[in-house]
A protein has these predicted regions:
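Short glycine-/small-residue-rich Rossmann-like dinucleotide-binding loops
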Residues: 70-71
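A short, well-structured beta->alpha microelement
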Residues: 45-58
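N-terminal beta1-alpha1 ligand-phosphate binding loop
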Residues: 21-43
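FMN-binding flavodoxin-like domain, especially the glycine-rich phosphate-binding loop
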Residues: 3-4, 14-17, 65, 74-197
């Protein structure tokens, strides 16, 4: 059965000559994920939306879907809902760009490989994984995040990541860290443009 909202949206896009084929989904209302999403929307002149499980089906209207979320304990925030509905949304033929925003080194192969594997981004040619450097300011964390983060630093990091990666994440978390950079989006933008050519 066709979704009338989806059909109407496609008709409006055709009438207005709107040929954007990329949407950015941000799983965050503030912070690094949201800022990266805003920059990406500006650079690609594409559509964007905040993460809302009731409206996530809209991604099926786009050829390229960019999902940006914070890395928490090795998992990209709310990505599991996208995977649970992968077939329902008809994402098999779409290019998916999964972006994790975290405190680890995006150039560390062990860190990136672990997150790629842990978040289900392996084994399919249409899924592309990118790590973006994030930021942390302990004084801006809410109480629950402070407790979770404290536990992760004391116990979880060394059980999850390689020693070098865990040490770096802990150091950055304890001293506040701001690695966010618009330039970090370069490889992602290049890949999207390349696949659209």
């Amino acid at each position: 059965m066709k979704n009338p909202n989806r059909t109407a949206r496609e008709d409006r896009r055709a009438e207005n000559g709107d040929s954007t084929d990329t949407i950015v989904v941000c799983a965050g209302k503030h912070g690094s994920s949201l800022q990266y999403g805003k920059w990406l929307i500006e650079d690609l002149e594409c559509d964007g939306m905040g993460f809302d499980k009731r409206k996530l089906g809209y991604v099926s209207m786009y050829r390229n879907v960019v999902y940006i979320g914070a890395v928490r304990n090795g998992d990209i925030h709310m990505l599991n809902l996208l995977w649970q509905n992968y077939n329902n949304f008809g994402l098999e033929g779409r290019n998916l760009f999964i972006c994790g925003v975290g405190l680890g080194d995006p150039d560390s192969q062990s860190y990136v490989d672990l997150l790629r594997r842990r978040n289900g981004c392996e084994g399919q040619s249409n899924i592309h994984f990118f790590m973006l450097p994030g930021t942390i300011q302990k004084n801006k964390l809410i109480m629950l995040d402070k407790a979770l983060f404290k536990n992760f630093i004391e116990v979880g990091a060394h059980g999850l990541y390689a020693k070098e990666d865990a040490d770096l994440i802990i150091e950055r978390a304890k001293n506040d860290y701001d690695g966010m950079s618009r330039d970090a989006l370069g490889p992602l933008i290049k890949k999207i443009v390349e696949l659209n050519a």
